[in-house]
């Protein structure tokens, strides 16, 4: 009997199939009865079938002999186990990936499109080869006349790889789908199937070989019953692409056509329409557009719009928890589906665990993230044919796997501590590549980290370094020399066992078993078993000449394609799965999460090795008994049907939800499926991240522990008697945690003042500080406390960053100036060759010293140094050329001032503080230029500060204490008149930024062309970017003394930005950066006021989390290393920026006078 049973997606097709199969088994127990279902639901279907049999016997359990519930692969093994000639060892996905990598590497000279190998490409190739094998396709018989070049190239390479693959496995291995081919061979010759019955259900599509299996059984078996779910529960031979059930109707059509062509009798049974359809059936009719409208559908469908994925996941957990707690449901009554479960792995499973909800996640877990795989990849990253490349990232990765722990460590915690310390030391000293071969004691003289002064600690770390480096280099050197595959694999295996890696995996397994985590306990064993199998497979694939690159590539690609097998830890558990995967029926409630426009429908856009266009071109070249399906197209055509199946799974209620924001706070739109459902129900529930009032609390209440955070939040905004009762019940169950959480809810994210006494212990009675430190205080006083009070800092890394580049600039110019002064050479007297020779002399000395020498070990850093040298050369040559236009010469470089220095700093009494306290300002000026005006008994001075990017003096930042540097430097000059001018008068020109750059103007810049459309020659070489900019004295006499050429009318300064003379002989100066001598004195006075004010706050122990913000993009938090400590949130009442608004010169002077109590 051949029968096709069809029903709607809500009809119990599987129940009917199981019922008939069990009935057949009871009537003919001596005959074989087979129930064939997708592998994904084999276990649950088997349980149902046996339960149904037991129920029919009025028993709670029963034994069976000839009733089999199998997947297609298990059906194959069932028949092949007794076959005369068994199959060779099956080549699994991982081993196949390894073999294909070997073939591609071997044949790469003959291939046209394979330049590099990656795991994704190998997987695509593997799937295509399986399709070719499964589809009975002969690549040699493909007519290439009408193929485009891309398709021809792919077929060319595919033919080479496919032939080599089949040749390699012949007689040694079988592919995972070859078992299906062999099954059909056995079935074709089997003469004992006449009494067997086969029942198929829950399939919507079959492969060519599976289709052939069913056709063979139709001709040989006593009974073949096929169950399908279609749109209307009937067969529609005229279904077209785009129709709701096109894919499954095409599947049915293949069988009906086969039966009709061979005049085989068959019956078609349909499920009858229900006279009183349930809400579930009504929803399905709406979804398939069989009806237009129905009442009361809201009882069956709930739409949820969540604030975030966290809120969405919490809604699911809360709904399940509450309904189970009320006794209406068991955990196994719930199914959670998502288009992509990976999006929810950091939300859903932790929330379910927090609420103690048992669950089974059937999403496959990849092996490639396991520590053993990381270790193997890291070993390969250090291998090179010429030399062993000891890269730091790989070495640290191996240490952090915790798989190679030397025997002298008795406690793992001690090893972990040393690994952290070793990483700190290595990063601080820039240890990379061959530097790993040197003892750590060779680096400590640099004294860049605390560890450098701890000899015993360095000895411990060096012992760990020696152990690891010796083991790694010994293994890789041996593998590089070895030619025998057998011996090489033995070396590799010995490395894993002799260094305790195997025993470490065994320990992890035992620990997981002891903790009751059966899933985790299986992973080390599965991984080790696969590794052993891969080593055996490699030996069979490549028994002769061993190749290290090939070995590691094959091993890594194999692991990347491997997954851990999953087992449920309990039968009563919520099931987590993905849309599109076959599910058994019987769920009472289904949650479909992640219903965003980007996820549903889940349209596949990334093709396989052969694109849909390639496949369409090839279709006409295949023989009649061969075909190649476009799985991507098949998936895309089946999306609506699959979503309908998901909706039909829920007996009582289905929830469909989506988040309005993703993890990056980007707005998400709901899926077109969600919008269709909204048209039916016209309502949605909004799940917020937090309850807004007490009445919202029901949407958040689960267990006492999980709900406590929400309760404490409500307590802070909307307390009530009812709430107090809830809190009392929670306190009874978890008193200690409740008290801690309630205290935390009252947390004020503002640091507390430490008081004068503690501040004095941190900073001393007198404050010895620099300008930049006080600027940090005004940027954010809490950052000042963390940096200079507690002395916290981010981990030191000896990398060539912006700070290092700036240091290199400064040191180059410092050494140049000192060399010139030492040899009494006027820079203006040097020609270009002499200047460059002096610069090179300075650089060579620098690069052989300290931190720069370590950085030079990296070839890329060497290139960066050359770029910096070009930049400093350009600035130095520009400076040299400009010296004939000014009498100012560099007298001092990196001039330090403060306590203990030749140059006095600012020493100011700190007012309004008990006791006697003083602030001593120290620092260093990049350069001070001096010009002796002998005829006037006067000395002209300017301060130069090097900057790696363009900078202007910002009045508003100065007023708020964040840009005091330049004014403070001028104050130092004034306070040290004797040092700079002796008995002469010191005249201040100003304080200027010198941008160290070789940047040119862009070709489309309007600065290159004047109003007459002529090119400005002085702009072409980027010279304006090298002009001084900053605070300047607006006294005309001082200006002409600094640049004598400006004594003529209509002259543009060649030294100072935005300075020129007008036709009438007066000066045009930058409005907000030029000051009279009286105004400069006012700035100096206010600068000292700021210094004293900051010192008072610091020494009194006052601390505020008060970062500045200027505009929308610039703030004290932009580049702060302490954001994780601040936990600053401008949305909180306690956390506010202190805003800085732009000031004009007039506003600045007015505000300063007001603050200093001076009359305007």
Curated annotation (Swiss-Prot):
Gene3D superfamilies documented for this protein: P-loop containing nucleotide triphosphate hydrolases
Keyword flag ATP-binding: yes
InterPro entries (alphabetical): ADDB_N, DNA_helicase_suRexB, P-loop_NTPase, PDDEXK_AddAB-type
BP term (GO), one: double-strand break repair via homologous recombination
Pfam families in UniProt: ADDB_N (PF21445), PDDEXK_1 (PF12705)
Enzyme Commission number: 3.1.-.-
Signal peptide coordinates: none
Record's keyword terms, sorted: ATP-binding, DNA damage, DNA repair, DNA-binding, Exonuclease, Helicase, Hydrolase, Nuclease, Nucleotide-binding
Note: Despite having helicase-like domains, this subunit does not have helicase activity.
Role of this protein: The heterodimer acts as both an ATP-dependent DNA helicase and an ATP-dependent, dual-direction single-stranded exonuclease. Recognizes the chi site generating a DNA molecule suitable for the initiation of homologous recombination. This subunit has 5' -> 3' nuclease activity but not helicase activity.
UniProt record similarity statement: Belongs to the helicase family. AddB/RexB type 2 subfamily.
Name of the protein this chain belongs to: ATP-dependent helicase/deoxyribonuclease subunit B
Native species: Lactobacillus acidophilus (strain ATCC 700396 / NCK56 / N2 / NCFM)
């Amino acid at each position: 009997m051949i029968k096709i049973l069809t029903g709607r997606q809500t009809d119990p097709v599987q129940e009917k199939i199981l019922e008939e199969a069990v009935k057949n088994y009871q009537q003919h127990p001596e005959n074989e009865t087979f129930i064939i279902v997708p592998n994904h639901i084999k276990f649950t279907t088997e349980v149902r079938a046996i339960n149904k049999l037991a129920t029919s016997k009025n028993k709670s359990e029963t034994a069976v002999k000839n009733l089999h519930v199998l997947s297609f692969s298990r059906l194959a093994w069932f028949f092949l186990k007794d076959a005369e000639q068994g199959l060779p060892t099956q080549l699994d996905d991982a081993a196949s990936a390894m073999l294909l990598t070997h073939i591609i590497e071997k044949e790469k000279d003959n291939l046209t499109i394979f330049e590099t190998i990656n795991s994704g490409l190998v997987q695509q190739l593997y799937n295509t080869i399986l399709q070719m094998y499964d589809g009975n396709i002969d690549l040699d018989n493909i007519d290439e006349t009408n193929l485009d070049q891309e398709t021809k190239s792919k077929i060319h390479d595919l033919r080479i790889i496919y032939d080599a693959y089949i040749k390699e496995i012949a007689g040694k291995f079988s592919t995972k789908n070859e078992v299906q081919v062999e099954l059909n061979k056995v079935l074709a010759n089997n003469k004992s199937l006449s009494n067997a019955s086969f029942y198929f259900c829950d399939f919507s599509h079959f492969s060519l070989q599976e289709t052939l299996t069913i056709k063979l059984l139709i001709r040989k078996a006593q009974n073949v019953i096929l169950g399908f779910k279609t749109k209307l529960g009937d067969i529609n031979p005229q279904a077209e692409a785009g129709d709701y059930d096109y894919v499954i109707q095409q599947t049915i059509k293949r069988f009906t056509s086969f039966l009709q062509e061979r005049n085989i009798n068959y019956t078609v049974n349909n499920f009858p329409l229900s006279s009183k359809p349930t809400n579930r059936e009504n929803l399905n009719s709406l979804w398939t557009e069989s009806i237009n409208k129905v009442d009361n559908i809201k009882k069956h469908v709930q739409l949820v719009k969540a604030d975030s994925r966290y809120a969405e996941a919490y809604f699911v957990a809360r709904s399940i928890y509450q309904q189970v707690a009320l006794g209406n449901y068991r955990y196994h009554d719930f199914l959670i589906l998502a288009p992509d479960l990976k999006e929810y792995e950091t939300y859903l499973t932790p929330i379910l665990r927090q609420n103690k909800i048992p669950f089974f996640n059937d999403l496959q877990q990849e092996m490639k993230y396991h520590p053993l795989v990381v270790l193997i990849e890291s070993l390969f990253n250090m291998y090179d044919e010429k030399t062993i490349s000891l890269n730091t990232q790989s070495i640290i990765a191996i240490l952090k796997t915790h798989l190679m722990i030397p025997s002298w460590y008795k406690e793992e915690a001690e090893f972990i501590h040393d690994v952290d310390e070793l990483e700190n030391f290595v990063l601080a000293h820039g240890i990379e590549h061959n530097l790993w071969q040197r003892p750590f004691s060779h680096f400590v003289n640099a004294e860049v980290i605390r560890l450098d002064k701890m000899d015993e600690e360095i000895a411990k770390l060096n012992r760990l370094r020696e152990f690891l480096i010796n083991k790694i280099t010994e293994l890789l050197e041996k593998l590089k020399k070895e030619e025998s595959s057998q011996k090489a694999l033995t070396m590799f295996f010995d490395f894993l066992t002799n260094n305790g890696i195997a025993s470490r995996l065994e320990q992890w397994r035992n620990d997981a078993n002891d903790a009751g985590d059966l899933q985790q306990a299986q992973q080390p064993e599965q991984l080790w078993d696969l590794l052993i199998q891969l080593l055996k497979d490699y030996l069979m694939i490549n028994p002769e000449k061993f190749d290290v690159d090939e070995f590691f590539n094959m091993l890594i690609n194999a692991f990347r394609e491997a997954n851990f097998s999953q087992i449920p830890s309990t039968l009563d558990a919520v099931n987590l799965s993905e849309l599109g995967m076959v599910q058994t029926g019987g769920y009472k409630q289904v949650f479909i999460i992640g219903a965003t426009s980007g996820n549903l429908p889940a349209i596949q856009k990334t093709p396989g090795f052969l694109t849909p266009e390639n496949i369409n071109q090839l279709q006409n070249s295949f023989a009649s008994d061969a075909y190649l399906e476009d799985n991507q197209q098949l998936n895309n055509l089946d999306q609506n049907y699959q979503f309908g199946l998901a909706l039909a799974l829920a007996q009582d209620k289905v929830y469909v939800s989506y988040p309005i924001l993703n993890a990056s706070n980007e707005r998400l739109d709901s899926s077109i499926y969600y919008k269709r459902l909204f048209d039916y129900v016209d309502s949605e529930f909004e799940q917020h991240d937090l309850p807004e009032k007490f009445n919202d609390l029901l949407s958040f209440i689960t267990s006492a522990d999980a709900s406590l955070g929400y309760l404490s939040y409500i307590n802070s905004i909307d307390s009530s008697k009812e709430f107090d009762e809830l809190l009392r019940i929670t306190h009874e169950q978890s008193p200690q945690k409740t008290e801690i959480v309630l205290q935390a809810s009252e947390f004020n994210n503002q640091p507390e003042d430490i008081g004068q006494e503690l501040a004095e212990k941190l900073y001393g009675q007198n404050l010895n500080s620099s300008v930049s430190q006080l600027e940090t205080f005004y940027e954010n006083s809490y950052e000042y406390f963390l940096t200079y009070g507690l002395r916290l800092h981010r981990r030191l890394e000896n990398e060539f960053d912006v700070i290092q580049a700036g240091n290199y600039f400064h040191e180059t110019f410092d050494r140049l100036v000192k060399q010139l002064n030492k040899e009494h050479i006027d820079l203006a007297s040097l020609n270009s060759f002499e200047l460059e020779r002096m610069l090179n002399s300075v650089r060579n000395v620098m690069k052989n010293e300290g931190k720069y020498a370590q950085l030079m070990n990296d070839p890329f850093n060497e290139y960066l140094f050359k770029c910096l040298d070009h930049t400093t050369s350009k600035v130095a040559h520009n400076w040299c050329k400009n010296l004939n236009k000014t009498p100012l010469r560099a007298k001092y470089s990196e001039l330090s001032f403060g306590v203990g220095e030749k140059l006095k700093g600012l020493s100011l009494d700190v007012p309004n503080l008990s006791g006697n306290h003083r602030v001593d300002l120290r620092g260093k000026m990049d350069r001070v230029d001096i010009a002796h005006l002998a005829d006037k008994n006067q000395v002209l001075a300017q301060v130069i500060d090097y900057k790696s990017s363009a900078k202007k003096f910002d009045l508003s930042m100065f007023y708020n204490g964040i840009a005091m540097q330049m004014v403070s430097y001028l104050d130092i000059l004034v306070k040290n008149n004797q040092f700079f001018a002796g008995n002469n008068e010191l005249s201040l020109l100003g304080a200027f930024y010198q941008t160290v750059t070789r940047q040119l103007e862009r070709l489309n810049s309007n600065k290159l062309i004047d109003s007459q459309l002529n090119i400005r020659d002085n702009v072409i070489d980027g010279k304006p970017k090298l002009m001084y900019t900053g605070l300047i004295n607006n006294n005309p006499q001082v200006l002409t003394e600094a640049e004598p050429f400006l004594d003529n009318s209509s002259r543009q300064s060649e030294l100072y930005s935005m300075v020129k003379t007008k036709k009438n002989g007066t000066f045009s100066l930058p409005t907000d950066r030029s000051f009279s001598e009286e105004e400069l004195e006012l700035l100096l006075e206010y600068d000292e006021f700021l210094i004293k004010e900051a010192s008072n706050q610091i020494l009194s122990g006052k601390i505020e989390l008060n970062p500045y913000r200027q505009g929308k993009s610039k703030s004290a938090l932009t580049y702060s290393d302490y954001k994780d400590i601040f936990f600053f949130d401008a949305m909180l009442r306690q956390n506010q920026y202190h805003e800085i608004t732009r000031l004009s010169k007039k506003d600045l002077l007015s505000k300063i006078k007001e603050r200093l109590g001076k009359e305007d």
